[in-house]
Amino acid sequence: MQKKQAVAHVVGHGLCSVRRACRYLGVHRSTYRYRAKPLAPKQIQLHQRMVALSWQHPRYGYRRIRALLAQEGWSVSRKQVQRVRRKEGLKVRPKPQKIPRQGVSTGLPTQAPEPNQVWTWDFIFDRTNKGSTLKMLTMLDEYSRRCLAIRVERQIQSEHVLFTLWQAMTTDGIPRYIRSDNGSEFIAQKIQTWLRENQIRTRYIDPGSPRQNGYIESFHSRFRDECLNREWLLNLREARVVIEDWRQHDNEERPHSRLGYLTPETFLANQKVSPEVGQNR
């Protein structure tokens, strides 16, 4: 493009002919004369949709934007999405790396082969616009990446943890294992006893081994990047509404790369597996 502009500049000032300018500057005359065809209305609409989705989801890369377009019925290549995003300056900045925690295990699950085989839970913190602390308990099914619950409180005690787990079990079934760090809420005797009575085994990650709890760490990174860092949370009530909306979006609308760019809900529906599968011990 710069060489074409140089040829146009030289010819425009009458310094030499097009033929000579192209020869000196190494530009083929057909290349110089080429003018891009105007985009068809459908292509313009597609371009605008790519830009709109990229602005709507600023932390989504080109693969996830392409998956969203496919959900809407658009047929678009990877390079086309990359080209438009590069032209519009919509490149996603690298995400910051996350750090996790750890805990005495009664089971040793590795990778969940089905829903409700392994759940994982942890805490994440944030602040309201006025500086008040928000403590959030997050709960995830490792197989489907489905977020089962995000409980938002000022403080979370063992009773809150048990009630949130009980609520998730009433709607999603009973997990065989729960993976977590060694947080005081998770190793509390009350929780240990309750889990044992319900035949739920525990898997505590080793100290300083965040990769052992990679699912929840990845979820927290996404949760902070796409929700907490973008929203002004005025108070606890608003935080609960905003975060629950995001949780539903993550489960029902957001394409997940590890699920073949399906949403967790669609992925589970495609498996044709009952949510009670984890109860078959």
Regions found by a protein language model. Give the residues of each.
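Charged DNA-binding/catalytic regions of mobile-element recombinases
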Residues: 1-281
